[in-house]
């Protein structure tokens, strides 16, 4: 059995129980509008990356420090998140947080939880201020998995040495890539592609433990 060397962790619905892009859009009074666009995307009214790009561009002029301050008020962490991160960090297991959310948001959680690597949307930044994003700044619809593969390649870690944790059909590419897959509070039938189903992130600890 391959030793687990990396955990691939989805963000919204997995590490956190709120859509954090909606939350930070509240900094500029656009939380409700972001929520509406996101609902329309899930209803099939927006194709490709257009909805995500629109929501990110609400944040033009917002700073990293504003985002950090907003998330320090409330982090919206899923039950068991801190326990899981403490467990993997103590054992030197690489963690890769992957999301369509923006790098400034993921950086806040990286600092909060000691996450090793982050993969997310990369808006143009002027100093610590968000200047916007375009479709050209994404490698493609599978940009999250592309980023994961690059990090693992640099670390010399093979797919069968990884565990992916996610909650929705958007995580299926990571589930199919990783050696082991865990669905947390699954939606959209993604549990059919998972090896395990959990409802608290700390429940992933014994699964990882038996693979060390």
Give the ranges of each region predicted by the language model.
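Short, acidic loop-to-helix structural element flanking the phosphoryl-transfer center
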Residues: 68-103, 107
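Surface-exposed amphipathic alpha-helices with a cationic face
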Residues: 82-90, 144-145, 149-156, 176
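Acidic, Mg2+-coordinating phosphoryl-transfer loop and its flanking beta/alpha structural elements
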Residues: 95, 99-100, 159-199
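Substrate-recognition "cap/lid" segment bordering the active-site pocket of phosphatases
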Residues: 107-162
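Short, acidic/turn-prone active-site loops that include or flank metal/cofactor-
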Residues: 120-126, 186-190, 202-204
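Short, charged, surface-exposed secondary-structure boundary motifs
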Residues: 126-133, 191-198, 207-211
């Amino acid at each position: 059995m391959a030793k687990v060397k990396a955990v691939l962790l989805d963000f919204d619905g997995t590490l956190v129980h709120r859509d954090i892009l909606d939350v930070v859009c509240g900094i500029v009074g656009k939380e409700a509008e972001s929520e509406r666009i996101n609902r329309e995307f899930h209803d099939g009214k927006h194709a490709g990356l257009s909805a995500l790009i629109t929501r990110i561009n609400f944040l033009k002029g917002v700073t990293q420090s504003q985002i950090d301050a907003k998330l320090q008020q409330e982090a919206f962490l899923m039950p068991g998140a801190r326990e899981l991160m403490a467990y993997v960090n103590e054992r030197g297991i690489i963690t890769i947080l992957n999301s369509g959310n923006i790098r400034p948001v993921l950086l806040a959680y990286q600092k909060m939880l000691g996450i090793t690597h982050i993969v997310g949307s990369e808006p143009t930044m002027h100093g610590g201020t968000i200047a916007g994003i375009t479709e050209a700044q994404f490698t493609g619809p599978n940009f999250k998995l592309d980023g994961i593969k690059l990090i693992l390649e640099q670390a010399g870690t093979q797919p069968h040495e990884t565990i992916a944790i996610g909650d929705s059909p958007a995580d299926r590419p990571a589930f199919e890539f990783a050696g082991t897959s865990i669905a947390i509070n699954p939606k959209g039938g993604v549990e059919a592609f998972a090896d395990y189903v959990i409802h608290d992130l700390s429940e992933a600890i014994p699964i990882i433990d038996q693979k060390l």
